[in-house]
């Protein structure tokens, strides 16, 4: 069974940077050693946003973007290696999620698409890459997402305490770690995505630091109720979503009914939308004693305060409190999934994704000989 140093690479729906994490992994433990966040050039970020909102592009443009993202991921890995004074031979493999540009797990031809050419990463780092993690699960009738609950269960499950792990990235997803029950998990809806999109358009800021804008505004209750009427929120699990659905166009359609509103009030309402949709799903799933939050949203003081208020009797904390950096959780998960792939172990949970069976995930791109 492969063990040793692995690197995880994650570029999420929030597009706030490439997260790269170094860890030692074996069948008994996952120990994080180092991490860094690598910036995404504005031009690449905008190109990804355009695709996710349905903008057409030529096959040549698409291929170039795939290559450029692969090179970007390789640069991020090489920067971490240099920082840690490591060589390619010191790393067993890289687990790279890729950049999701479309996720449509239902319909006549279910599919999901993550780009960032793994061949570029393997060639430019000299390290074996495991990627394309989601499509085997979809081929077996699953949603292809979320995949991180398996990792949450391996690291954070408790024999007696009802726990849930909440990742608030661009999309928010929940892992249900309930003793005596199969692991559950699904996407609850928007996490930071709509908040980030709104403040970017209104103030040119990548995100609402310390929720300053949202705290200066007031929740517009009719707008909140209008958004909560979206059928995704009442759809039963298994379910997953992404930027192709909850994007700026989605927000604009709801705002048409509310002309002339204060932008800060919209920001406050979007924060409340995230908090309410998460808390409702926690309660519908039977509640928990401890909700451990990770992802960029765990740094949003308003979101954390609202979750605590909406979930009385639940200890709302961050995964940092149990020794796992909330900023690095997803990248760490894909390093772990790469380890499982090389070990020939399944990486999905049918109780989460709805797949017909467990399966080894991903494709392997060997290092240069």
Curated annotation (Swiss-Prot):
Its EC number is 2.7.1.170. Belongs to the anhydro-N-acetylmuramic acid kinase family. Keywords: ATP-binding, Carbohydrate metabolism, Kinase, Nucleotide-binding, Transferase. Gene3D superfamilies: 3.30.420.40. One of its GO terms (biological process) is amino sugar metabolic process. It catalyses: 1,6-anhydro-N-acetyl-beta-muramate + ATP + H2O = N-acetyl-D-muramate 6-phosphate + ADP + H(+). It comes from the Bacteria. This is Anhydro-N-acetylmuramic acid kinase. It comes from Escherichia coli O7:K1 (strain IAI39 / ExPEC). Catalyzes the specific phosphorylation of 1,6-anhydro-N-acetylmuramic acid (anhMurNAc) with the simultaneous cleavage of the 1,6-anhydro ring, generating MurNAc-6-P. Is required for the utilization of anhMurNAc either imported from the medium or derived from its own cell wall murein, and thus plays a role in cell wall recycling. Signal peptide: none annotated. CDD domains: ASKHA_NBD_ANMK. ATP binds at residues 12-19. GO terms for molecular function: ATP binding; kinase activity; phosphotransferase activity, alcohol group as acceptor. Pathway: Amino-sugar metabolism; 1,6-anhydro-N-acetylmuramate degradation; Cell wall biogenesis; peptidoglycan recycling.
